[in-house]
């Protein structure tokens, strides 16, 4: 269980659906898909990245900020009672009970790469199995796997979520950059060593995703510091 991780959903008065979660910017857990009509607040490139950084760890702020940027009004915000604590969504609240939350969050729709980098996802899907390796940089001469520090770095991502400091978002995003760089390196190794095209394509998708996320969050920290 990822400490402090949760999703918030909002519906605008014109029927649009926007979601946000409490981790990173444009972070979507592996295997989670978003339906085509659902927008992700922190992945919206029409909003300055420094502005999106201010929402980090506070998804209710994210859906409010997204609506404000697009000159839209929220009809309702959906979250649990705990998630509404200390936050007034400024509109109708739909409080989820434990029975309302499905055991599996699997949905049909766009994978995480398609959400944050649709052009890259389309290009990857169009590449034949034989051409996948051409998308990669040359493999290093050292064929040993890189040290796996995933658990340690992910704990650093979670640690700020244990704090009530309202400025915890900066520490959280800084840790997320480190994690993203590590995840990118791990995915690239898997892409170089995969024996099956399906596994290689999945590893390349992860490599591109974490590459985009690392750049996005680094830029968000620079953008927010400049203000």
Model-inferred region functions:
Residues 1-227:
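Secretion-targeting segments and adjacent low-complexity export tracts
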């Amino acid at each position: 269980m990822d400490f402090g991780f949760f999703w918030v959903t909002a519906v605008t008065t014109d029927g649009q659906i926007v979601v946000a979660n409490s981790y990173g910017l444009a972070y979507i857990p592996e295997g989670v898909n978003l339906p085509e009509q659902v927008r992700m607040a922190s992945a919206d490139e029409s909003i300055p990245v420094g502005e999106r950084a201010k929402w980090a760890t506070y998804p209710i702020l994210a859906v409010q900020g997204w609506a404000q940027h697009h000159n839209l009004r929220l009809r309702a915000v959906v979250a649990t009672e705990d998630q509404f604590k200390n936050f007034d969504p400024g509109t109708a609240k739909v409080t989820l009970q434990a029975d309302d939350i499905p055991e599996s969050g699997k949905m049909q729709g766009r994978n995480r790469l398609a959400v944050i980098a649709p052009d890259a996802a389309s290009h990857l899907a169009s590449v034949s199995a034989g051409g996948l390796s051409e998308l990669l940089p040359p493999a290093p001469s050292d064929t040993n796997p890189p040290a796996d520090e995933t658990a340690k770095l992910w704990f650093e991502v979670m640690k700020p979520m244990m704090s009530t400091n309202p400025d915890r978002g900066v520490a959280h995003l800084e840790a997320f950059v480190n994690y993203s760089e590590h995840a990118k390196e791990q995915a690239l190794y898997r892409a170089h060593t995969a024996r099956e095209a399906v596994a290689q394509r999945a590893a390349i998708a992860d490599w591109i995703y974490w590459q985009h996320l690392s750049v996005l969050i680094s830029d968000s920290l620079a953008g927010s510091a400049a203000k």
